[in-house]
Every structure is written in C-alpha cells, then in structure tokens.
Amino acid sequence: MELAKAFEPADIERRWYPEWETQNYFAAGVDASKADNFCILLPPPNVTGTLHMGHGFNQTIMDALTRYYRMRGHNTLWQPGTDHAGIATQIVVERQLDAQGISRHDLGREKFLEKVWEWKEYSGNTITKQMRRMGTSPDWKRERFTMDAGLNKVVTETFVRLFNEGLIYRGKRLVNWDPKLNTAVSDLEVVQEEEDGFMWHIRYPLADGSDSLVVATTRPETMLGDTAVMVHPEDERYKHMIGQMVKLPLTDREIPIIADSYVDLEFGTGCVKVTPAHDFNDYAVGQRHGLPMISILTLDAKVNENAPEKYRGLDRFDARKAVVADLEALGILEKTDKHKLKVPRGDRTNVVIEPMLTDQWFVAMSKPGDDGKSITEKALDVVHSGEIKFYPENWVNTYNQWLNNIQDWCISRQLWWGHQIPAWYGDNGQIFVAHSEAEAKAEAAKQGYTGTLKRDEDVLDTWFSSALWPFSTLDWTGDEAIDAANPLLKQYLPSSVLVTGFDIIFFWVARMVMMTKQITGQIPFKHVYVHGLIRDGEGQKMSKSKGNVLDPIDLIDGIGLEALIEKRTTGLMNPKQAESIAKKTKKEFPEGIASFGTDALRFTFASLASPGRDIKFDLNRCDGYRNFCNKLWNATRFVLMNVEGHDLALEHQQNGPACGGSAPLEFSFADRWIVSQLQRVEQEVEQHFTDYRFDLIAQAIYKFIWDEFCDWYLEIAKVEIQTGNDAQQRGARRTLVRTLEAVLRLAHPLIPFITEELWQTVAPIAGRKTHDSIMLAAYPRAEEYKIDAASEAKVERLKALAYACRNLRGEMNVSPALRMPLLVAGGGAEISEFAAILQALGKLSEVQIVDDMPADAMAPVAVVGETRLMLKVEIDVAAERIRLAKEIEKLEKQISIAQGKLANEGFVARAPAAVIDQEKQRVADFTATLEQLKPQLAKLGQA
C-alpha cells in the first residue's frame, strides 16, 4: 500500500475510529489467566454537556495509560459513563420550559421528569461522540449513566445501609442556599469573587444604658437575626462588658456579649455581631456557646416573620437599604466605609448564595460506624498506610487537610431531577428509610404505624452517586454471593489509577475513598494522579465571560474567525461583553484557528502534563506537534521508498555469513547506535509511564523521532544505502524499518491515529504484523543487551565533527548550495570510516585526510578533540577582512548598548527580572561571538 504524499488527519481519523470500535478492540479483558489487570474510571462528565479543554486533557492522559497497558498485555478496562448532573440538567430544561411560558410546577414532577429524560436522550450523546473524536478507547459497551436502573439500586442500597448504621441522618443545619433555584448547593457550585461593597459601623447600646459597642458588618440586614455580640477574651477594652446584655437596634430583643478567641483583636473595633442562622463562622460560634438560631429569611430570600413587622416581605437587598436608613435616622450608624469583599455566588445562577438554616439529610463524617471507626478515619488510614498513593505526593497534604477539618456532608437537594431520597414520612413525622414503598410500609407496620406514607421529595446531591462510581459501574449488588461471582469486581476493584484535577480532590476523590471503603471494605483505586487545570496562554481560567474558551473539536477540525466569534459571544450571561470578546478574538485569531488534527492536539496535551496547579495552553505547540506528525509521516515515506521490494534478510539475526542460504547481513556502527538509542528511550518511556510523567514521555518520544531518527539516522542511512556493499545495505534497510516499526508502537498511546495508519504498511515489511491493529501489538520494551556504548560514543564523535563542519560554513558565510573539500588532520582510522557520512552531512565535495593543515591557509580551523578541520576554499582576503571588521564593529556597538542598559539604575529598578536576564544573556552571546571573530581578523593581517 502506497502512503499518501501528505498527512491528512481527518481522513485517517474517520476511517480508523469506527474500525476500532466495530472490532471491539476496546472491550474489557476478563482473561483470568492473565496476572495483570489495569482499570481506570472516566470521571463522568455531565450527560448533556459538551467537551471542553479540561476534558480533552484529562481524557488524553487516561487513554494513553489505557492503550499502554493494553499493549503491555494486561486485562484492561477503561470504564466510561456520564453523570446526570442534577442542578445543571434541571436548569437547562427549566430554561427551555420558561421560553414556552411554562414552569416545572405547571407540569408537575412526573411530567417534568419525562421532559428531562427526553432532553437527556436528545443531547446525551454529544459528549461521548466528541470523546470518540479525541481517539479515546473506553469499553463503550459498558457505558453507564448515574441514573441507570442498576446504579439507582446501588444508590438506594448505600443510603439504606448508612441510615441503618446511624451514619445518615436528617437535621437542621446551615447550608449554601441558592434562592433562585430554591435548593442547597455544594461548595463547588459556589464562586467566591472579590466585589466592591461597604462596611457599616453600627453602635449597639448596652441594655442598662451605661455604655455601647460599635460592630462592623458588610450585611446590616442580618442584624435582625443577631443573637450575640462577641469580643476576644483577652481584649482589655471589653473585658468588663463580657456577660452583659446589649439592646439589639431596630428590635425589642436583648442579646449577650460573649467572649470567643475567634475574634481578631486587630480587625475593626474588635467587636463582632453573631448571626448563627446566616453565617457559617457564626454558626460554629453559636454551637460552641449554645446561642439560639434565628433565621430571618424565607427560602426565596425575603424577610420572614422572625424580623420586626416593618421589614417582613422585603427582598434581602431592599431590607438592607431599609435597615441602613433606619439606623441613620436613629443616629447609631457611626460610619460607612467602602470595602472589598468576597461575595459567594451560584455558579449557574450568579445570585448571591445565602447561608440558610434548613432541614436536610447529612452523612455523618466523624461518627464511628459499627466497626468503631468513622468514615473519615478510614479514608485517612488508607492514604496514611500507603494503600492509596498520590502522584505528585504533595497532594496528600491537601487530602489530609480537608479530611481533618471535615463537616458532615449535606446530601439532599431541593430538586426533582436526581436520585429521590428513599425515605417516607408518616403523618406524625416518623421517618421510614427503605428500598421501596412496600418495604417502608412493612417497616412502618412493624413500628405500629398504619397510616399513609409520603415520600421525601428531595433528591440526593449528584456527588453522592458519583462517590459510588468505582463499584456501582462494576455491577456491584450488595449480595455477597452474586458479587463474589462477578469477575469484573474481582479484577477491577480497586482500579489502578484515578486521573483527576486537584479541584475535586475533596468533592469526588475523598468521597469515593470514603464510600467505597465503607460499603465494600475495599479501596476504590491504588493510585491518584492529580493534574493541574488548563488555563489560557496567559494563565487565566478559561470561561465564557472572559471570552477565552477553546473547543478541542475546533482545534482538531479548525474554525473560521466569524464562526469562532459567534461561538464565543452566543449565550453570554452579560451580552454587553460580546463586543470586547469579538475584538479580543479578532486580535488573537485574525484568520480563525487552523486544523491540527487529533494526534497533534493529544501530543500537545501530553507535553503540557507537568506537575503543578496551572497548565498554560499554548496553541503554538499544536502547530509544532502537527509539524512533528508531518515529520513522522515523511520519514515513513522515505523508509518505505528505500526498503519496499528489497531483501531485508529478516530471517538472519547476526553480522556474518549466511545461515541456511539467507543473504548476509552487516550492521554498521550507526545501525547499532540507533538500536541502542531505541532501547534507552524505551526504558525512559516505561519509567515515565510508571511515574505518570506524560510531559517527559512526549519529550522523550519527540526527541528520539525528530532528533535521533529523522535528523541523524535517516541521513546516515541514506549514505549507507548509496555507498555500502549488499550486506551493509541490508543492515541499514532492516534497521530503518525495524526501528520505525518499534517507534510507531512506542508513540501509539499518545498519537493513535497516525501510528495505526503507518503501522499497517510498515509492520508487514518489518516482519512484525502480529495483530490486526497496532493497539493490540506488544508495547516495545528495552533489551539491555542491545545497548552499545561504543557505537554511541562513535556517533557522538561523528556528530561533533558534523557540527564543526557546519559551524565553519556559517563562520565563512558559505552558501549551502556550494560544495567544497574539507581538510581533516588527526583522528586516525575513524576519520576514514566517517568520511562518506561526513561528506553528505557537511555538504562537501570530498573529505581529504591530511597530515597537517597548510601553513599559509587563511581559512578558520575547527578543533574536535585531536582532530582539526578546515574548509578548503579560496577566500578574497580583502573582502573577508572588511566583512569581519564590520561584524566586529556591529557586535561591539550592541555590547555597549546592552551594557549601558544594565548600568542604568532606573532600568534595572523598573524592568522585570526576565528582561534583565535577557540583556545579560545578550552581552554574553555577543561577547562569545566577538571572541571568535577577532582571532580570525588578526589571522588575515592588516590591510
């Protein structure tokens, strides 16, 4: 099969992915005779979402690992699936209904859920189709959805077990409340951004009228729910007031002055109002001091009946204005300062989140279970003991810090879309938790209740079902006999590694550890590879409002400027941003975005996967790695042109005479060198896979293919094929095709499409077409006996000579098209061996080996070890003298300018460190060049 002249990724991707999927190459291995199993879980993306750069990055890493271990011969399962994404999905469907003038309450729960399922079926495949475009290889036949019937059963079973063990309870606690959605939300769904606000200073008079205190607050409306004022116990200003009562302004209540070390002595007046029902820190203070909890807001953030009558029914922000006006009228508003503060907003609604005291369901994090240990304790133990390892290890500190400061987990949400809580209520408020209504009725009857039961309308936090992902996706039932016979559970729990961003270590990683350990007794995974988050080129978070979002599919296929602008400006929360986003996009991508293909994008993602919190995405890298793919394609065409139809003596293994009539074969030092280098890169890549250093894998593969194989070995092999005898030509040809075939397998986990396409042609010629697809072929592993230090040293000397030759041409400004002789003195027999190769690499007419350089030669001489080299060229001494003098004058001027900048105190004080370092480097570089040119001018003598 002849390769196309140019690498066209779109055509290759269209052909190969359906073939891989149709042939069932991604299927989970269940061969019990294999000792090794590899399993990885896809963090389930939102079912109605679309692929973003974070997904593309994360999935590239997971796919590279999966393909690597599949090629290593492991039973392999990459478990895919999607998340029902309670709030996100419900909001989308509610917006669709709003556009028709209908609310979910108009429809009722059952009809509304039908609409959500319709939307899920309509848009639920978008993200998995996009994943396929990324070349991912999960077992699609095992795809799961968190609302599947099987997973729903696992959720119910887990809830019932934890409730029966006393580890799930219902209680009144402070939670993040979204007044627009009318539901509790998780910390991850709250965005804290700095905004301009005010600090109001209010005077609270002592009840006996003898004195007063001034408290400062950013939320004066909540003072209507104050239940104390606190001061630091060591604050001499207020020690005498501790235990006294103050009159709460605008109300008829008196509240105590309490002492608590939470107060910052240095901040404000040192007096802090305490509103336990509307502030998380105050709630903790209230718990410590047994303060009453007075909630003054309704669930839609209007003032309720617990506040004075004049404020009731006001929106919280209108109430703020009214309270401030009344305080001013009373003359007790001491002052108002402008103040920057962090305002918590819902990430989906942008409304200010309200700490709200509501009845919710919680998982007890610190309460001992039946085995005497809390859920949190067990989760800490398995990391402390090394059962679960983090890569990089420093993320253990984050994990421990969160778990050591953990609060009980609020798992209920006031939504309709999600896993409905399996709890039923009797008329008298009794709670019956069961697997079904029938079971709940039976349990109620046991307890003597025979009245009607009403099911809890709330659903579970999406993270609850996600926390069960490691075992719910493997068909766990909770029945010991059934689960013991399940080969998937036996082979793939715990899974091998979890690949995740650091932002969900607590929300997802820790909770999977807790729940899997608590319910199954096993850890969910052995390793956690934590990566940074993809940012734009300037390190900014990618977001719709910033107008810097990139779609991975657009990088694969390309997108025109107008289409890109439309994409970035459609659906903005603030339409006024559209103009500035369009302007920025035109500046950044004046011609739109070129198509790079999947392989180039994947290689870019891998190369960026270095340890750290932030990963700056650089589009130029995509361009560079598209060129890398082109280089590999063209190198393969060169190899095929030189080996197809030729005898490669594939049956023959050693240098020397023929065996059994096969043709003789001879490997040169260069052949042995590239094979030796191949072993080293194979060793390197294997170690980097073990360490999860995908950036170093990409770097090692790139360096070997571009530098060693293409830039050096192909050029040397050309010479060997042109000038060698039959045995040497066979050695070079066989080394070419065998090395290329191994390299394609080596690079396959990162760039699957191009390697599959090329391997299909290369492997049969190399005698290594062992499988129908490269993804099933064995991953190359180093054979140490093939490492040849002597050949490596020899090629390093050859490289040094070639570099010296190129430098001589550069120094003398010789045209690349001009071929001339090279004089070489010293170096012994090795120079004769190198001569033909050096002639080709140096673009020389010949290599002349001489005893010494001509005494009257005016051309510069390069020295490499004991070898001296000089281009044999007639030079116009006068013209060369003028050229060198001008070059020296120019360099001296540039050195003077740079040194002048560095001597300027103002410049040094203002300039960034990087700019100063750049100037210093310029001086060093100019000086080094100057030191080379001055001796050359001196050698030419005076005019």
Swiss-Prot record:
Record-level GO BP terms: valyl-tRNA aminoacylation
Keyword Coiled coil included in the entry's annotation: yes
Stored Pfam families: Anticodon_1 (PF08264), tRNA-synt_1 (PF00133), Val_tRNA-synt_C (PF10458)
GO cellular-component term (any): cytosol
Sample GO molecular function, one term: valine-tRNA ligase activity
Entry keywords, A to Z: Aminoacyl-tRNA synthetase, ATP-binding, Coiled coil, Cytoplasm, Ligase, Nucleotide-binding, Protein biosynthesis
Protein EC: 6.1.1.9
Coiled coil: 875-934
UniProt motif ('HIGH' region) ranges: 45-55
Catalytically driven reaction(s): tRNA(Val) + L-valine + ATP = L-valyl-tRNA(Val) + AMP + diphosphate
Signal sequence extent: none
Gene3D superfamilies with a match to the protein in the record: HUPs (3.40.50.620), Isoleucyl-tRNA Synthetase, Domain 1 (1.10.730.10), Valyl-tRNA synthetase, C-terminal domain (1.10.287.380), Valyl/Leucyl/Isoleucyl-tRNA synthetase, editing domain (3.90.740.10)
Record's subunit section: Monomer.
Domain notes: ValRS has two distinct active sites: one for aminoacylation and one for editing. The misactivated threonine is translocated from the active site to the editing site.
Protein name (database record): Valine--tRNA ligase
Naturally occurring in which organism (per UniProt): Dechloromonas aromatica (strain RCB)
Higher taxonomy: Bacteria, Pseudomonadati, Pseudomonadota, Betaproteobacteria, Rhodocyclales
